[in-house]
Amino acid sequence: MNTPPETRPDRPIRSQYEDFMRHVDAHGVFKADRTGTGTKSVFGYQMRFDLNEGFPLVTTKKVHLKSIVQELLWFLTGSSDNNWLKERGVTIWDEWAREDGDLGPVYGVQWRSWPTPDGGHIDQISEVIKTLKTNPDSRRIIVSAWNVADLSKMALMPCHAFFQFYVAPATEAGGKGKLSCQLYQRSADIFLGVPFNIGSYALLTHMVAQQCDLDVGDFIWTGGDCHIYSNHAEQVALQLSRAPFPYPTLHIKRKPESIFDYQFDDFEFLDYQHHAAIKAPVAV
């Protein structure tokens, strides 16, 4: 896998995300796809973001923070109802929702209510919090949204399918461990989807770290089929013509009683400097 240079405070600002986009634009091969749009694609890529160096929001275009935060909170409710999002002014799932708003057993359902053969359910998020608090050295701190038995019932199969947490021990007496998260994304729409996914899982890592009394470490994004849609070529060229700004800083205003009690207003993104938004069609 190709890992671009990390952004460091003592170096000129160079965004891993834009390097990723350049790599796919230069080396991608044409592939047909499910939507009939066509893509320029590479297989396998990785980016590593040190969350202590800022919150990794894309700055070469405006990212819709409200949608990122509300979607993550929606996942954590365990809901499959798009109406929850629409009531909060978020429309990113509208293209896939059924008439009544249902999306089938998508991300939140699998995270919170993975079905078991005996008719029960597993709350994977609660298990993660419990394990991080009681056995942080475990190599099994994993959440999967890729439930093969349920795929045909989903309005959209999971693109970001599987993530794992890792705790690096404290380096000094009385210090805190550092929580890192690695996401595997089987299908990555680089222009529209990946900026959301990076922001969402970076935010989740901060939330889980706060709940488990840990410091944040790295967020590692790993992609499978990484692609630029053919009808995003002009938008990509425009975005790559822009110079990135420094990352903003995330401030979480309070510590709720549980991972499920955060509200939208709990999060503040300080000094988010960005270029103008760039519109592009969604491949459905």
Curated annotation (Swiss-Prot):
Catalytic activity line of the entry: dUMP + (6R)-5,10-methylene-5,6,7,8-tetrahydrofolate = 7,8-dihydrofolate + dTMP
Main location per the UniProt record: cytoplasm
Keyword list (alphabetical) reads:
Cytoplasm, Methyltransferase, Nucleotide biosynthesis, Transferase
Q: Where does (6R)-5,10-methylene-5,6,7,8-tetrahydrofolate bind?
A: H64, D189, A283
Q: Which residues bind dUMP?
A: R34, R139, R140, R186, S187, A188, D189, N197, H227, I228, Y229
**InterPro entries associated with the record:** Thymidate_synth/dCMP_Mease (IPR045097), Thymidate_synth/dCMP_Mease_dom (IPR023451), Thymidate_synth/dCMP_Mease_sf (IPR036926), Thymidylate_synthase (IPR000398), Thymidylate_synthase_AS (IPR020940)
Name the GO cellular-component terms: cytosol
Q: What pathway does the annotation place this protein in?
A: Pyrimidine metabolism; dTTP biosynthesis
- Keyword Isomerase assigned to the entry: answer is no
Q: Where in the cell is it found?
A: Cytoplasm
State which Enzyme Commission number(s) the record gives.
Answer: 2.1.1.45
Q: Name one GO biological process term.
A: dTMP biosynthetic process
Broad class of enzyme this protein falls into: transferase
Function, as annotated, reads: Catalyzes the reductive methylation of 2'-deoxyuridine-5'-monophosphate (dUMP) to 2'-deoxythymidine-5'-monophosphate (dTMP) while utilizing 5,10-methylenetetrahydrofolate (mTHF) as the methyl donor and reductant in the reaction, yielding dihydrofolate (DHF) as a by-product. This enzymatic reaction provides an intracellular de novo source of dTMP, an essential precursor for DNA biosynthesis.
PANTHER family xrefs: THYMIDYLATE SYNTHASE 1
Q: What is this protein called?
A: Thymidylate synthase
This chain's source organism reads Polaromonas sp. (strain JS666 / ATCC BAA-500)
Gene it is expressed from: thyA
